[in-house]
């Protein structure tokens, strides 16, 4: 009977008997499938009927044999198919809600027309809500009563977040709305002024300066805020006392170490083969331009540490007496005074370095020590500083430019062989040379060499050291 083709096959009675047979049959073990449920193939679309009827004089079966799973499925468009698909959508597990970035506070459409109350401008009613261009939802218009209530409740019930470090106070301390006067909310030009405005920096709403809402939270914060310790001003801030004169705490030890470092620096430069082929005048041009930077690299390599003390500035009476003594004594130089912690040296004899200038030297030394620069890396950095093609008065520019480029190439190859991150190490080493721009050569001369050489200029001393054997 199962293999025969009966004439009532496809009728309602045949389908009911076949369904009862499949229901009372012993359930078979479900096979493991790659897909949870099969929803038929394209055979269910032919013929496309919405109701069970007679298409072309022939009965249309409610079920069809699937080409994928081999089972019977209801035809698409039939009543049975619609019932099954609607039941599937009803009992399907709800999807997890997507994570939203935060509440949307509308677009610029809420400002047109800018009204403070809901009224009839121009004889047309203004809707309290508008459709947002970003999220597609309805938001209250800015300046309306509903908008003010929502923004006020948002600021009241939201948990206070930790304040971020800002360079100049809170966002509402900006002068963006300071040009709008008025301590009370009024109607300038017949229009009501909104209590809040949209900030251009953070995109949030803040109360206007001068309004009652602005004065209330600011006064509360000022009354209840705990006194915090103000951060120290940086060394380049002239208003924090960074221009106060300082001197070495142990001048004899530090000056001797600096003199030894200068001798080693000039010995390193003088006996370079590529430097010896230059004329004496070109050698002098290069050394006079970069001796201070080369000395700083040498002091960093020797790990020279020094301390300074503050000295008092000379009074007007001391300046007058010093000038009169020099006029009466002729051109005889003043004796070098013994540097004591709080004894002011004569202002005409030398300019005492300031605390900010000395701090720039210490910052450079600390930067070099933090990188643990090797001896070869110090030598390549010295070569980069020495062969500077931008020095004024230099004639062999192409030759010096080639030497600097070759030194940088050797340094790059060395860092690639000794470190895994070649570009990071190479950039860090060259970044130390940028700090040398904040160090003045006259400050180094006054701090380390003036107590020893007196009134002799550093240029004359460089010429003497280049001409003599050291």
Swiss-Prot record:
GO aspect biological process, one term: negative regulation of DNA-templated transcription
Span of the annotated motif LXXLL motif 3: 146-150
Function text: Nuclear receptor that lacks a DNA-binding domain and acts as a corepressor that inhibits the transcriptional activity of other nuclear receptors through heterodimeric interactions. Component of a cascade required for the development of the hypothalamic-pituitary-adrenal-gonadal axis. May also have a role in the development of the embryo and in the maintenance of embryonic stem cell pluripotency.
Name used for this protein in its record: Nuclear receptor subfamily 0 group B member 1
Any Pfam family the entry gives: Hormone_recep
UniProt KW keywords: Cytoplasm, Nucleus, Receptor, Repeat, Repressor, Transcription, Transcription regulation
GO cellular component: cytoplasm; membrane; nucleoplasm; nucleus; ribosome
Domain characteristics, as noted in the entry: Homodimerization involved an interaction between amino and carboxy termini involving LXXLL motifs and steroid binding domain (AF-2 motif). Heterodimerizes with NR5A1 and NROB2 through its N-terminal LXXLL motifs.
Lineage: Eukaryota, Metazoa, Chordata, Craniata, Vertebrata
Boundaries of every NR LBD domain copy: 205-469
CDD domains registered for this protein in UniProt: NR_LBD_Dax1
TM spans (from-to): none
Motif AF-2 motif per UniProt: ranges: 461-466
Sequence repeat intervals: 1-67, 68-133, 134-200, 201-253
Span of the annotated motif LXXLL motif 1: 13-17
InterPro entries for the chain: NHR-like_dom_sf, NR0B1/2, Nucl_hrmn_rcpt_lig-bd, Nuclear_hrmn_rcpt, Nuclear_receptor_repeat
Oligomer and partners: Homodimer. Interacts with NR5A1, NR5A2, NR0B2 and with COPS2. Interacts with ESRRB; represses ESRRB activity at the GATA6 promoter.
């Amino acid at each position: 009977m199962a293999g025969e083709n009966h004439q009532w096959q496809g009728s309602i009675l045949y389908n009911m008997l076949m369904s009862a047979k499949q229901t009372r049959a012993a359930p078979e073990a479900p096979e493991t499938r790659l897909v949870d449920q099969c929803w038929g193939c394209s055979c269910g679309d032919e013929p496309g009927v919405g109701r069970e009827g007679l298409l072309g004089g022939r009965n249309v079966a409610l079920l069809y044999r699937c080409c994928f799973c081999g089972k019977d499925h209801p035809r698409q468009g039939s009543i049975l198919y619609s019932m099954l698909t609607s039941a599937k959508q009803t009992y399907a597990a709800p999807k997890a809600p997507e994570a939203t970035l935060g509440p949307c506070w509308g677009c610029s459409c809420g400002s047109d027309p800018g009204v403070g109350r809901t009224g009839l401008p121009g004889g047309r009613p203004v809707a309290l809500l508008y459709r947002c261009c970003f999220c597609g939802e309805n938001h209250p218009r800015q300046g309306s009563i509903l908008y003010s209530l929502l923004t006020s409740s948002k600021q009241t019930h939201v948990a206070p977040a930790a304040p971020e470090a800002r360079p100049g106070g809170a966002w509402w301390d900006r002068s963006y709305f300071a040009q709008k006067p008025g301590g009370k909310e009024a109607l300038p030009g017949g229009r009501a002024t909104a209590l809040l405005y949209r900030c251009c920096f953070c995109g949030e709403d803040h109360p206007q300066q001068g309004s009652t809402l602005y004065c209330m939270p600011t006064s509360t914060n000022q009354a209840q805020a705990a006194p915090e310790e103000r951060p120290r001003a940086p060394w380049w801030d002239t208003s924090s006392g960074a221009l106060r004169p300082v001197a070495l705490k142990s001048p004899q030890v530090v000056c001797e170490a600096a003199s030894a470092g200068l001798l080693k620096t000039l010995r390193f430069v003088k006996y370079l083969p590529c430097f010896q082929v230059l004329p004496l005048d070109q050698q002098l041009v290069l050394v006079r331009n970069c001796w201070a930077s080369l000395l700083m690299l040498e002091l960093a390599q020797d790990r020279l540490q020094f301390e300074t003390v503050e000295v008092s500035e000379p009074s007007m009476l001391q300046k007058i007496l010093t000038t009169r003594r020099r006029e009466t004594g002729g051109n005889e130089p003043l004796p070098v005074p013994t540097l004591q912690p709080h004894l002011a040296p004569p202002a005409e004899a030398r300019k005492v370095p300031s605390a900010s200038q000395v701090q720039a030297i210490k910052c450079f030394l600390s930067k070099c020590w933090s990188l643990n620069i090797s001896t070869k890396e110090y030598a390549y950095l010295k070569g980069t500083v020495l062969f500077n093609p931008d020095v004024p008065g230099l004639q062999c520019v192409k030759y010096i430019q080639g030497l600097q480029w070759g030194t940088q190439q050797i340094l790059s190859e060395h860092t690639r062989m000794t470190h895994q991150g070649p570009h990071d190490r190479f950039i860090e080493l060259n970044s130390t040379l940028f700090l040398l721009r904040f160090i003045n050569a006259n400050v180094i001369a006054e701090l380390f060499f003036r107590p020893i050489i007196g009134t002799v200029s550093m240029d004359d001393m460089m010429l003497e050291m280049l001409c003599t054997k050291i």
